[in-house]
Amino acid sequence: ESRCRRNMLDNSINIRGIKRVAVDMAGYVPAPVCPTSTGKRIAIIGGGPSGLSAAYYLQLMGHQTTVFEKRKKLGGMLLYGIPSYRLPRERLQDDINVILETGVEVRLETSVGNDPGQLSLDELRKEYDAIYIAIGAHSDKKIGIEGEDAGGVISAVEFLRAIGDGKYPDLTGKKVCVIGGGNVAMDVARSSVRLGADKVAVA
């Protein structure tokens, strides 16, 4: 907006606001018609932005895709890392629904790996022509200080994931200290206020 030519007259156009209105008012947008099947089957590990995008465009190429997601819902970090006040769940689900309308198959609560009870890559290779791995970045980062594993200390990823799962921590009357000052830290701080924290400090 700082480069908007309108600044030469008065003020810039509210580009973000216009985009938000456009998305909110667009209504239902049907999925494109997919071409005749190529007969190829592709396994996609991970139901986040990357996996869902790959599934969508592969379906538009005529390939049959199956998304394997270890959690209960699709969306990845869009659901489990971004609070609903920033990305309304209804808008996210609308986009996911359009992707699914192309014929994407989904297997929720299905993990792929080498542990007992998990699907192995070898099993997928036998059934599918190709595998796309889109497992995302869901691991939290430790800062290496004393007490970071103490009771009452929780990582931002774990905190926001719980909210995404609908398991809202009860912070009523509590004091919360958020270490960090980036976007994720702000999400945690603002979510803590919404969860009833008496005081929230960002350090």
PLM features per residue range, with description:
Residues 24-63, 78:
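Extended interfacial segments that mediate partner engagement and assembly in macromolecular machines
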Residues 44-68, 108-125, 139-141, 158-203:
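Rossmann-like dinucleotide/flavin-binding elements
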Residues 9-14, 50, 59, 84-91, ...:
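Catalytic cores of large soluble enzymes that bind and process phosphate-bearing ligands
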Residues 18, 78-129:
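N-terminal Rossmann-like dinucleotide/flavin-binding domain of flavoprotein oxidoreductases
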Residues 135-149, 154:
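Flavin (primarily FAD) binding-site architecture
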Residues 132:
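N-terminal Rossmann-like NAD(P) cofactor-binding module of classical short-chain dehydrogenase/reductase
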Residues 1-22, 66, 70-73, 103-106:
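Iron-sulfur cluster-binding cysteine motifs and their immediate structural context
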